[in-house]
């Protein structure tokens, strides 16, 4: 077990430390997606879990539930996009959350 093994072991330890830092950053990250000029907002945590959904009463029309569904999907897509933009990069894994 020469220096090559030691070097790989150090590299593995460094990657592990970097991943730990990224995980900590993701735990503290929250993003808000918006649709319909704020009629619907969705908050996602750094690991992609939906934390909160807010729907303003004026956008609820029982005759047009499809419109509300579209707003919810749009707010979720916006939140997911923001999450990808704000997530810390993972060294060696470009586009990890893409």
Curated annotation (Swiss-Prot):
Return one GO MF term: DNA binding
What Gene3D superfamilies does the record point to? Nucleoid-associated protein YbaB-like domain
UniProt KW Nucleotide-binding keyword: no
- The superkingdom listed in its UniProt entry is Bacteria
Keywords from the UniProt entry = Cytoplasm, DNA-binding
Tell me what this protein is called: Nucleoid-associated protein pc0477
Keyword Manganese in the entry? The reply is: no
HAMAP family (UniProt xref): DNA_YbaB_EbfC (MF_00274)
User: What family does this chain come from, according to its entry?
Assistant: Belongs to the YbaB/EbfC family.
Function statement = Binds to DNA and alters its conformation. May be involved in regulation of gene expression, nucleoid organization and DNA protection.
Q: What binding partners and quaternary form does the record give?
A: Homodimer.
Q: Where in the cell is it found?
A: Cytoplasm, Nucleoid
Q: Which Pfam families match?
A: YbaB_DNA_bd (PF02575)
One GO cellular component, as annotated: bacterial nucleoid
């Amino acid at each position: 077990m020469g220096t090559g093994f030691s070097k790989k072991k150090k590299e593995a330890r460094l990657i592990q430390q970097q991943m730990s830092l990224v995980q900590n950053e993701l735990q503290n990250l929250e993003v808000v997606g918006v649709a319909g000029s704020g009629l619907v907002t969705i908050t996602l945590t750094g690991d992609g879990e939906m934390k909160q959904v807010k729907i303003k009463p004026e956008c609820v029309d029982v005759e047009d539930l499809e419109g509300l569904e579209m707003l919810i999907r749009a707010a979720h897509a916006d939140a997911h996009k923001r999450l990808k933009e704000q997530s810390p990069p993972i060294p060696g894994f470009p586009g990890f959350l893409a």
